Amino acid sequence: MTYPTTARTLLGNIEHNLRGIRARVGDRLVLAAVKANAYGHGAAAVSQMIERTGAADWLGVATVEEGLQLRDAGVSLPILKFSPTRDVDDVTRALLAGITLSVVDEASIAQVAAAADALDLSEVAVHLKVDTGMRRVGAEPADAPALAASIAGHPRLRLQGVFSHLPISDSPAGDEFTRQQAALFADTAAAIEAGVGPVELKHLANSGGVLGHPETWFDLVRPGIMIYGSLPDPQAQRTVDLHPGLELTTRISFVKPVAKGETVGYGRTWTAPRDTYVATIPVGYGDGYSRLLSNRGRVVIGGASYPIAGRVCMDQTMIDLGPDPVAAVGDEAVLIGRRGDAEITVSDVAELMGTIPYEVTCLITPRVTREAVD
């Protein structure tokens, strides 16, 4: 028997979102970010769908291991690893698997070049990451032309791409900063191309850039959270119709009467305000359903929304059904998703947790049953 708590990836909705992104950005290439297990949606299933349908042109990962897992799943699309790779064995494994690496300084360039030499590979494509304002990883813009020349000067390397990242493109408060970043990136790319010739792929736009900043689109865009149906920020422009990429459901395991004045759960933090019935569902923070939802989250049962009663436990959570329950053991409980007119979105859960949609889906743990449906 499968674990009754199920994360269901809605591949048709994810494809719809990618089609909407394509329609918005025109003839630019699309790189789908599938790092962190496709933001908790299942990287193999999502990537296989993307390759099968042609919904995107590239995939993006955070680690070499993530890229290798996609290759093991039969995915042959181009894969870009976003951050530099410092481990020699990882560089070698990446090149053997055809994973495109990012470089940020002379050391990372030399490391890829040495691996290419050792493997007798030629025309090994790399992407040079430039820091235009994130202040996290990347070459300084003033240093980028010299680094590009270093890449171009190595007989086994090819500078395929130049890219940067936007820290506040999803918020109107950051519009001017984003425009400044786009201008700096354009100037830096022009300086690079003046020295080494045309660069095939210049890319800057993330989800916020796709939604609200056409000046960031360049040759390729790199959407992330919007692929999976959520806005990167509640204030982000809604310029693409997005459908939810995931449902999280379980089934009621127990129902019992609770008298007015009785308490429920650890710490006795919830007191029944009237005679009621409380349902238990087999999901908790051990499944990635955050304890921050204690006494504030809701679930959908039978097309109606009900509140969490007490603290979310490691493996179970209690729900106040009210004095006249229609629910019974075995009935479905929806933690993320829609039934009838009642809906709980990833963004709803994120707001209650005081976090972002990215974290909500990334928290889902391996013991939750996984399904992927069209």
What residue spans do the PLM features occupy?
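Active-site anion/phosphate-binding pocket segments in diverse small-molecule metabolic enzymes
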Residues: T2-E15, R19, A23, E66, ...
